[in-house]
Each structure stands twice: as structure tokens, then as C-alpha cells.
Amino acid sequence: MNVLLCYINTLNRFYDISAVEVGQHFYWQIGDFQVHAQVLITSWVVIAILLISTILVVRNPQTIPTSGQNFFEYVLEFIRDVSKTQIGEEYGPWVPFIGTLFLFIFVSNWSGALLPWKIIKLPHGELAAPTNDINTTVALALLTSVAYFYAGISKKGLAYFGKYIQPTPILLPINILEDFTKPLSLSFRLFGNILADELVVVVLVSLVPLVVPIPVMFLGLFTSGIQALIFATLAAAYIGESMEGHH
């Protein structure tokens, strides 16, 4: 009898897992347009966290830095090092862009694990990390594409497009395809990792609600930070490559 009850409980848990929805969305109707409300709400929360924390720390800088000031200075120095390593000596103007990408993605990824999005009920779907949605990651990747095209054209003018026929014009289609695959690889890598992490946690919580999901959540926090670093580093590398030439 006990074996039968355990079997039934296991089936019930798998039934609960099957009810987990990935594609449900909540939209706002603005005129003739449907706006993806989930992504906007969570993105605004992440932006608010970044703005408020920055204002609180830097509005009154101290001669002897506070712990918060030390942290922000360390983050800025870290972003400068990444930008300089990937872009070169002309990295200065690109530090704000690379830093914004890194901080937004980092806080977005961590918000999926640390913020209780589930307590906010929506008519359809549920709130999650902004980077859990392909719309966000594609938008970030397209911004990166615009940035490295701008970097190359602003430095070399129309001669920038000469890279597409180097080292031989036969490679023109491949070189063009490469520029299209860069944003795709950036967006799908980030989206896939964050979505997979959240789904694994949901499944484990459904099966074993107590202790087992905790190590996975800590691993998710670590990989979320790594994904933010990878995205920012690759964005800086693409910008540096467009300014230096085709490699």
C-alpha cells in the first residue's frame, strides 16, 4: 500500500511539472500594438535597482570610501580592464556601453533567483528574469551589432566594408553571414542558459522541495554572473575587432 501511495505521489509531482508553462505571455494593448508587459515590468525593476543603488552610493562620495563606494569603484575598474583588454587603447568611449550591458545582464540574471517574482500574479504567464525572454536577449545582441558597426564605420568610413572581401572576394557570403550569426549566438547563449537554469530549479522544487534545489540555485547564481561577463567580453571583442580590422 505504501509503495502504491509513493507511486501516486510521484505521478502527481510529474503532473505538476507538466503544468509549468514556458510560452505564456501577458500583453498590454496600446492602440493597435501589443506590448510584452512581463519583460517591461521586470526590466523596469532591474533598471530601478541599478539607478537607486548608484544614486545612494555616489551622490555623496567620501574621501575615505565607504564599502558601497569601494564596491562600485571595483566594478568600474573591472569593466575598464575588460574593455581595454578587448578593444585596445581606444577603449575609453566604450566603457559606459560595456558597463551598462554587464550590469543590466548581471542584475537581470540574479533577479531570477533572488527576487520573489512568483508572488506577483498576472492574468497570463508569470514574471521572471528579463533575460529569461528571447526578446530581451535579442534586443541586447542587436544593440551590440549596431555598436560594432558604428565603431568600425566611425573609424574607417566606407572602407570598413572592405573587410567583407578579405582575404578573397570568394568569402563575401561567409563574412556577411558571420556578422549575422554574432548577435544570434550572443542572444541564444544568454537566453538558453538563463531559461534552462530557471526550469531546472522549478523541476527540482516540484520533485524535492527542500534541500536539493539549494545547491542548484547557488550554481545558477555563479553561471548567471559568468554569462553576464561572457556577453560583455564578447561585445567588447566584437567592437575591438571592427575597429582593428578583420581577423
Curated annotation (Swiss-Prot):
It is a multi-pass membrane protein. CDD domains: ATP-synt_Fo_a_6 (cd00310). The chain crosses the membrane at residues 38-58, 95-115, 134-154, 199-219, 220-240. Its main location: plastid. F-type ATPases have 2 components, CF(1) - the catalytic core - and CF(0) - the membrane proton channel. CF(1) has five subunits: alpha(3), beta(3), gamma(1), delta(1), epsilon(1). CF(0) has four main subunits: a, b, b' and c. Belongs to the ATPase A chain family. This is ATP synthase subunit a, chloroplastic.
